[in-house]
Amino acid sequence: MAEASVDASTLPVTVKKKKSLSIEEKIDIINAVESGKKKAEIAAEYGIKKNSLSSIMKNKDKVLEAFESLRFDPKRKRLRTAFYTDLEEALMRWYRIAQCLNVPVNGPMLRLKANDFAQKLGHNDFKCSNGWLDRFKSRYGLVFRAQPVEATGVPVDPSTVWYQNVLPYYLNDYHPKNVFNIKETGLLYRMLPTNTFAFKGETCSVGKLCKDRITLVVGTNMDGSEKLPLLVIGKKRTPHCFKGLKSLPVCYEANRMAWMTSDVFEQWMRKLDEEFQAQQRRVVIFVESFPAHPEVKNLKSIELAFFPSCLSSKCIAMKQGVIKSLKIKYRHCLIKKFLSSVEGSKEFTFSLLDAVDTLHLCWRAVTPETIVKSYEEAGFKSQKGESDITNAEKDTGLDLVADALGAGVEFPEGLSIEEYAALDDDLETCEAAPNGDSICTKESKSDETGFYTSDEEDDDGSPGTELPLPSKSEAITALDTLKKFLRSQDMNDGLQNSLADLENFINSLSPK
């Protein structure tokens, strides 16, 4: 009997549905493969094809990153990211901090915060709709539950919470080379040891002291591999000693009080942001919560992290040892310059330009070891590997004090070089509501300050008689003298190359 022919087109088509795995299951698969289990057995166990397993292993880094950073709910099956990535990261960071502080968060509060972050980040077209909020909660696995009654009465130490929960969140997101801290400090840039006890603890000195004060802003990264250019804030935009200069080794700003202001801070942050953008880097900069440190909108490469006001200065890395090291080195140089004047029977003068050059020199000399130790003492423990640096630099000031005493510099009895360097640590450095008595006033000529300066000096410490800028031929002659001196010493290749660079630069200039 003939068999009836069957038309294949009439048969029902069975399509096997592709199995979707959650991120959690993909993590289990990755662990199984790396433990040595056969891929065929793993594929059979999870009901997937071998090429699907290969695809999971190919995207292993993305899966692990999403799982470890809690950017997605582990039960989710796809790693579809959001359009407003920076907004979502900021919102999730805020949510995690609220959780740490036992602050109950609900939908309306999250919507309000999302709109607030959108405005600060420059997303003017963003509106937090119910649909967007639902998708956001789904992406991150957020479920709002009523807070247990007993939890509301538990006392929380904000400082402990910040160290245990908030700081590690940042350190997990950023490599130590991209974690920065900045800090202001006041400096009486011409203060020699004479009569220094009269100035200890002053917050806004008067008269000549006020005139001779500047604010420094120092900043480094966490692993000590990078120091931000010093920001120096003086009183005059173009002091006498800067006349004719087109460049300085530091960033320089000026205002009446020589303080950090919100405008100066924002301008500086935007300048740094451009530099980090050019390097294609993302960094976090920790700053104190001051009116002079506003939130700066639309930064592309910098995330500003503000220390809670409840934290003490011990959490500020720059305060632990970096500023101390810089000031000790600076005081060393200042006294040495004075000693040189005494030995040469010359009147000692020290201008703001001298201070800027000296600060740049000393800033370069602050070691990575000192920086790393300062961060560790401030509680910054790297989540990406422990530091192997145990000892910071040690400044030896005993010989310097002895030399200074021998040359006639009066060190008050018991005053160490460290104490001398720290005498201006309490100077105000940021804009605030000033007390009328602390505003700088004019000092009479009869006031004694212990400064070795003459009455002919300008406010910036430079001599009243203007000296002409050297010509190109004079610069070449000076360089020849410098080369002869250096080549009589044991000079390395780096200095030889630097001399060649200097000569090429001078020769490239048009004659004046």
UniProtKB/Swiss-Prot annotation:
Pfam families: CENP-B_N, DDE_1, HTH_Tnp_Tc5
Region of interest called Disordered, as start-end residue ranges on this chain: 434-472
The UniProt record lists the keyword DNA-binding: yes
Residue ranges annotated for the HTH CENPB-type domain, each copy included: 75-146
Alphabetized GO MF terms: DNA binding
Gene name of the record: TIGD4
Keyword Nucleus in annotation: yes
Domain DDE-1: 174-375
UniProt keyword annotations, A-Z: DNA-binding, Nucleus
Record-annotated HTH psq-type domain positions: 12-63
Chief location category: nucleus
Protein name stated in the entry: Tigger transposable element-derived protein 4
One GO CC term, this protein: nucleus
Native organism: Homo sapiens
Location of the protein in the cell: Nucleus
Regions recorded as binding DNA: 39-59, 108-139
Record SUPFAM superfamilies: Homeodomain-like
Family to which the UniProt record says this protein belongs: Belongs to the tigger transposable element derived protein family.
